[in-house]
Amino acid sequence: LAMFKALTAGGTIIMGRKTFDSFNGRILPHRDHIVISRTLKKGMKQSGSYRVCSDLDSALQHALTESFNPIFIIGGASIYKEGLREAKKLYLTRVDTVVENATAFFPEVDLSEWHAVSKIPFPADEKHQFPFTLETYVRKLV
């Protein structure tokens, strides 16, 4: 989470309603929030403010016209899948474990379309139950 916090601070985060619900009504500090939902009402507030858009295209349009902040798509699975078409850079955390009965997954990525910029491995330790790798990719120019 420290990497997520450092990376997204000062940016705009776009997420689906279920991901937003997982925040338990908290607004993450130092970030603009856009929630993609057809059920939330525009302008609702819970411990801060956020914008509601009905689809990813309108969320991206709002983010691009309202600020020059970097934009991060932070989930869930269907928002990730749809957002991959627009992504210029990927920040992936690969955790070296198998989760039994998992129901949500990051979509498959064709890495032949991307340049690996960095891969930083971390061992399991007292703070991390499993080893993991932080990976950064940039989209290849066509």
Tell where the protein language model's regions lie, with residue ranges.
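Enzymes that bind and transform nitrogen-containing heteroaromatic metabolites
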Residues: 1-142
